[in-house]
Amino acid sequence: MEACVSSLLVLALGALSVGSSFGTQIIGGREVIPHSRPYMASLQRNGSHLCGGVLVHPKWVLTAAHCLAQRMAQLRLVLGLHTLDSPGLTFHIKAAIQHPRYKPVPALENDLALLQLDGKVKPSRTIRPLALPSKRQVVAAGTRCSMAGWGLTHQGGRLSRVLRELDLQVLDTRMCNNSRFWNGSLSPSMVCLAADSKDQAPCKGDSGGPLVCGKGRVLARVLSFSSRVCTDIFKPPVATAVAPYVSWIRKVTGRSA
Protein backbone atom coordinates (compact mmCIF):
# COMPACT_ATOMS: atom_id res chain seq x y z
CA MET A 1 0.00 0.00 0.00
CA GLU A 2 2.90 2.34 0.80
CA ALA A 3 4.27 2.06 -2.73
CA CYS A 4 0.85 2.86 -4.21
CA VAL A 5 0.48 5.96 -2.06
CA SER A 6 3.96 7.09 -3.08
CA SER A 7 3.10 6.69 -6.77
CA LEU A 8 -0.10 8.68 -6.40
CA LEU A 9 1.70 11.46 -4.56
CA VAL A 10 4.32 11.84 -7.27
CA LEU A 11 1.69 11.91 -10.01
CA ALA A 12 -0.68 14.40 -8.45
CA LEU A 13 2.05 16.82 -7.46
CA GLY A 14 3.39 16.52 -10.98
CA ALA A 15 0.25 18.23 -12.24
CA LEU A 16 1.67 21.45 -10.85
CA SER A 17 4.01 21.81 -13.80
CA VAL A 18 3.61 20.88 -17.45
CA GLY A 19 6.10 18.22 -18.51
CA SER A 20 6.57 16.82 -15.00
CA SER A 21 5.34 13.48 -13.70
CA PHE A 22 1.64 14.23 -14.21
CA GLY A 23 1.74 16.38 -17.30
CA THR A 24 -0.27 15.23 -20.30
CA GLN A 25 0.56 12.11 -22.22
CA ILE A 26 -0.66 9.49 -24.63
CA ILE A 27 2.11 7.04 -25.43
CA GLY A 28 1.26 5.45 -28.76
CA GLY A 29 -2.17 5.97 -30.25
CA ARG A 30 -2.92 7.93 -33.40
CA GLU A 31 -3.91 11.40 -34.54
CA VAL A 32 -7.67 11.91 -34.43
CA ILE A 33 -9.66 13.06 -37.43
CA PRO A 34 -9.68 16.85 -36.89
CA HIS A 35 -12.67 17.97 -34.78
CA SER A 36 -14.10 14.45 -34.56
CA ARG A 37 -14.15 14.94 -30.76
CA PRO A 38 -15.76 18.39 -30.53
CA TYR A 39 -16.33 18.02 -26.78
CA MET A 40 -12.60 18.09 -25.95
CA ALA A 41 -11.32 20.92 -23.77
CA SER A 42 -7.78 22.00 -22.97
CA LEU A 43 -7.25 23.38 -19.46
CA GLN A 44 -4.29 25.72 -19.79
CA ARG A 45 -2.08 27.66 -17.42
CA ASN A 46 -0.46 30.78 -18.85
CA GLY A 47 -1.05 29.41 -22.36
CA SER A 48 0.41 25.93 -21.74
CA HIS A 49 -1.71 22.78 -21.77
CA LEU A 50 -2.17 21.32 -18.29
CA CYS A 51 -5.09 18.84 -18.28
CA GLY A 52 -7.87 17.59 -20.47
CA GLY A 53 -11.55 18.23 -19.95
CA VAL A 54 -14.92 17.51 -21.51
CA LEU A 55 -17.68 19.96 -22.41
CA VAL A 56 -20.86 18.57 -20.79
CA HIS A 57 -23.07 21.69 -21.02
CA PRO A 58 -22.91 24.93 -23.06
CA LYS A 59 -21.47 26.65 -19.96
CA TRP A 60 -19.63 23.85 -18.15
CA VAL A 61 -16.56 21.62 -18.54
CA LEU A 62 -15.94 18.50 -16.45
CA THR A 63 -12.35 17.65 -15.49
CA ALA A 64 -10.32 16.01 -12.71
CA ALA A 65 -10.42 17.90 -9.41
CA HIS A 66 -6.69 17.55 -8.82
CA CYS A 67 -6.03 19.62 -11.96
CA LEU A 68 -7.14 22.69 -10.00
CA ALA A 69 -4.11 22.76 -7.69
CA GLN A 70 -3.22 26.04 -9.39
CA ARG A 71 -3.84 29.75 -9.07
CA MET A 72 -7.21 30.09 -10.75
CA ALA A 73 -6.33 33.47 -12.24
CA GLN A 74 -3.72 31.72 -14.41
CA LEU A 75 -6.11 29.12 -15.81
CA ARG A 76 -8.10 29.25 -19.05
CA LEU A 77 -10.26 26.75 -20.94
CA VAL A 78 -9.78 26.42 -24.70
CA LEU A 79 -12.37 24.66 -26.90
CA GLY A 80 -12.46 23.76 -30.58
CA LEU A 81 -8.79 22.77 -30.80
CA HIS A 82 -7.10 20.15 -32.94
CA THR A 83 -3.57 21.56 -32.77
CA LEU A 84 -2.48 23.22 -29.54
CA ASP A 85 -0.98 26.20 -31.36
CA SER A 86 -4.24 27.05 -33.17
CA PRO A 87 -6.35 29.86 -31.66
CA GLY A 88 -9.41 27.90 -30.50
CA LEU A 89 -12.13 29.53 -28.41
CA THR A 90 -10.74 30.69 -25.06
CA PHE A 91 -12.77 31.21 -21.89
CA HIS A 92 -11.98 32.52 -18.44
CA ILE A 93 -13.22 30.31 -15.60
CA LYS A 94 -16.17 31.95 -13.86
CA ALA A 95 -16.48 29.27 -11.16
CA ALA A 96 -14.64 26.07 -10.22
CA ILE A 97 -16.56 23.50 -8.17
CA GLN A 98 -14.78 20.39 -6.93
CA HIS A 99 -16.94 17.47 -5.87
CA PRO A 100 -17.87 18.00 -2.19
CA ARG A 101 -16.38 14.63 -1.23
CA TYR A 102 -13.17 15.04 -3.22
CA LYS A 103 -10.16 13.67 -1.35
CA PRO A 104 -6.77 14.86 -2.61
CA VAL A 105 -3.52 12.88 -2.62
CA PRO A 106 -3.03 10.16 -1.60
CA ALA A 107 -6.68 9.07 -1.94
CA LEU A 108 -7.78 10.97 -5.08
CA GLU A 109 -11.36 9.84 -4.46
CA ASN A 110 -14.28 11.61 -6.18
CA ASP A 111 -11.67 13.25 -8.42
CA LEU A 112 -14.07 15.44 -10.42
CA ALA A 113 -14.59 19.17 -10.82
CA LEU A 114 -16.92 21.36 -12.86
CA LEU A 115 -15.60 24.55 -14.45
CA GLN A 116 -18.06 27.25 -15.47
CA LEU A 117 -17.19 29.21 -18.61
CA ASP A 118 -17.51 32.98 -18.62
CA GLY A 119 -19.70 32.67 -21.72
CA LYS A 120 -22.06 30.23 -23.41
CA VAL A 121 -21.02 27.90 -26.21
CA LYS A 122 -23.10 27.83 -29.38
CA PRO A 123 -22.86 24.20 -30.58
CA SER A 124 -21.09 23.84 -33.92
CA ARG A 125 -19.11 21.30 -35.94
CA THR A 126 -15.98 21.94 -33.86
CA ILE A 127 -17.48 22.58 -30.40
CA ARG A 128 -20.31 20.47 -28.99
CA PRO A 129 -21.13 18.99 -25.54
CA LEU A 130 -20.82 15.25 -24.94
CA ALA A 131 -23.90 13.53 -23.54
CA LEU A 132 -23.83 12.40 -19.92
CA PRO A 133 -24.49 8.73 -19.13
CA SER A 134 -27.56 7.51 -17.33
CA LYS A 135 -27.20 7.14 -13.56
CA ARG A 136 -27.52 3.38 -14.08
CA GLN A 137 -24.73 3.06 -16.64
CA VAL A 138 -22.53 0.01 -16.08
CA VAL A 139 -19.24 -0.36 -17.95
CA ALA A 140 -18.22 -3.98 -17.43
CA ALA A 141 -14.72 -5.43 -17.52
CA GLY A 142 -13.72 -6.07 -21.11
CA THR A 143 -15.65 -3.08 -22.49
CA ARG A 144 -13.83 -1.21 -25.28
CA CYS A 145 -13.29 2.51 -24.70
CA SER A 146 -11.28 5.32 -26.23
CA MET A 147 -9.76 8.54 -24.95
CA ALA A 148 -7.90 11.49 -26.42
CA GLY A 149 -5.31 14.04 -25.35
CA TRP A 150 -2.53 16.37 -26.45
CA GLY A 151 0.16 14.50 -24.57
CA LEU A 152 3.70 13.39 -24.91
CA THR A 153 4.20 10.61 -27.43
CA HIS A 154 6.98 9.03 -25.37
CA GLN A 155 8.19 9.14 -21.78
CA GLY A 156 10.00 12.40 -21.06
CA GLY A 157 9.09 13.91 -24.44
CA ARG A 158 7.15 17.00 -25.45
CA LEU A 159 3.44 17.66 -25.77
CA SER A 160 1.88 16.55 -29.02
CA ARG A 161 0.85 19.44 -31.27
CA VAL A 162 -2.20 17.49 -32.44
CA LEU A 163 -4.98 15.71 -30.58
CA ARG A 164 -4.26 11.98 -30.39
CA GLU A 165 -6.51 9.09 -29.39
CA LEU A 166 -5.96 5.67 -27.87
CA ASP A 167 -8.16 2.57 -27.62
CA LEU A 168 -8.45 1.07 -24.13
CA GLN A 169 -10.14 -1.83 -22.40
CA VAL A 170 -11.74 -1.78 -18.96
CA LEU A 171 -10.01 -4.18 -16.55
CA ASP A 172 -11.51 -6.10 -13.65
CA THR A 173 -11.44 -3.82 -10.58
CA ARG A 174 -10.85 -6.68 -8.15
CA MET A 175 -7.73 -7.64 -10.08
CA CYS A 176 -6.56 -4.01 -10.18
CA ASN A 177 -6.99 -3.75 -6.42
CA ASN A 178 -4.95 -6.84 -5.55
CA SER A 179 -1.47 -6.70 -4.03
CA ARG A 180 0.33 -6.96 -7.39
CA PHE A 181 -1.46 -3.92 -8.78
CA TRP A 182 -2.97 -0.96 -6.84
CA ASN A 183 -3.10 -2.91 -3.56
CA GLY A 184 -6.49 -1.75 -2.29
CA SER A 185 -6.09 1.91 -3.33
CA LEU A 186 -9.09 1.95 -5.69
CA SER A 187 -12.50 3.09 -4.45
CA PRO A 188 -15.78 1.69 -5.87
CA SER A 189 -16.12 4.57 -8.36
CA MET A 190 -12.69 3.93 -9.89
CA VAL A 191 -11.87 1.67 -12.82
CA CYS A 192 -8.52 0.78 -14.35
CA LEU A 193 -7.71 0.48 -18.02
CA ALA A 194 -5.26 -1.11 -20.43
CA ALA A 195 -4.30 -0.46 -24.04
CA ASP A 196 -3.96 -3.24 -26.61
CA SER A 197 -0.16 -2.99 -26.45
CA LYS A 198 1.96 -2.81 -23.30
CA ASP A 199 3.89 0.01 -25.00
CA GLN A 200 0.81 2.26 -25.12
CA ALA A 201 -0.81 4.17 -22.27
CA PRO A 202 -2.48 7.40 -21.25
CA CYS A 203 -0.62 9.21 -18.50
CA LYS A 204 0.82 12.44 -17.12
CA GLY A 205 -1.98 14.93 -17.18
CA ASP A 206 -4.24 13.43 -19.77
CA SER A 207 -6.09 13.42 -16.48
CA GLY A 208 -9.37 15.22 -16.76
CA GLY A 209 -9.92 13.92 -20.27
CA PRO A 210 -13.01 11.85 -21.14
CA LEU A 211 -13.35 8.17 -21.89
CA VAL A 212 -16.09 7.18 -24.31
CA CYS A 213 -17.08 3.52 -24.04
CA GLY A 214 -19.16 1.17 -26.15
CA LYS A 215 -21.07 2.12 -29.29
CA GLY A 216 -22.85 5.22 -28.00
CA ARG A 217 -21.21 8.64 -28.00
CA VAL A 218 -21.76 9.03 -24.26
CA LEU A 219 -19.31 10.03 -21.54
CA ALA A 220 -18.36 7.09 -19.31
CA ARG A 221 -15.19 7.97 -17.36
CA VAL A 222 -12.79 10.83 -16.60
CA LEU A 223 -9.10 9.93 -16.41
CA SER A 224 -7.74 10.42 -12.89
CA PHE A 225 -4.24 9.04 -12.27
CA SER A 226 -1.56 6.60 -13.34
CA SER A 227 1.96 5.57 -12.43
CA ARG A 228 5.19 7.53 -12.77
CA VAL A 229 6.15 5.01 -15.46
CA CYS A 230 3.22 5.41 -17.82
CA THR A 231 3.40 1.91 -19.31
CA ASP A 232 3.84 0.02 -16.01
CA ILE A 233 1.51 -2.95 -16.50
CA PHE A 234 1.18 -3.42 -12.74
CA LYS A 235 0.00 0.18 -12.20
CA PRO A 236 -2.56 0.64 -15.00
CA PRO A 237 -4.18 4.06 -15.48
CA VAL A 238 -7.26 4.75 -13.36
CA ALA A 239 -10.40 6.68 -14.28
CA THR A 240 -13.42 7.91 -12.32
CA ALA A 241 -16.85 6.59 -13.31
CA VAL A 242 -19.21 9.44 -14.24
CA ALA A 243 -22.57 7.69 -13.74
CA PRO A 244 -22.53 7.88 -9.90
CA TYR A 245 -22.05 11.66 -10.15
CA VAL A 246 -24.69 12.52 -12.77
CA SER A 247 -27.13 13.92 -10.19
CA TRP A 248 -24.42 16.22 -8.80
CA ILE A 249 -23.41 17.34 -12.30
CA ARG A 250 -27.00 18.13 -13.28
CA LYS A 251 -27.62 19.98 -10.02
CA VAL A 252 -24.55 22.20 -10.47
CA THR A 253 -24.97 22.86 -14.19
CA GLY A 254 -28.71 23.41 -13.80
CA ARG A 255 -28.10 26.49 -11.67
CA SER A 256 -26.85 28.35 -14.73
CA ALA A 257 -29.45 27.10 -17.22
From Swiss-Prot:
Propeptide residues per the UniProt entry: 24-25
E.C. number(s) listed in UniProt: 3.4.21.-
SUPFAM superfamilies according to UniProt: Trypsin-like serine proteases
This protein's UniProt keywords: Apoptosis, Cytolysis, Disulfide bond, Glycoprotein, Hydrolase, Immunity, Innate immunity, Protease, Secreted, Serine protease, Signal, Zymogen
Cell cycle found in the keyword field: no
Signal sequence coordinates: 1-23
Coiled-coil positions: none
Disulfide bridge positions per record: C51-C67, C145-C213, C176-C192, C203-C230
Subcellular localization(s) per the UniProt record: Secreted; Cytoplasmic granule
A Gene Ontology term for the protein's cellular component: membrane
Family the entry assigns: Belongs to the peptidase S1 family. Granzyme subfamily.
PANTHER family in the record: GRANZYME M (PTHR24271:SF51), KALLIKREIN-RELATED (PTHR24271)
Protein name: Granzyme M
Source organism of the structure: Homo sapiens
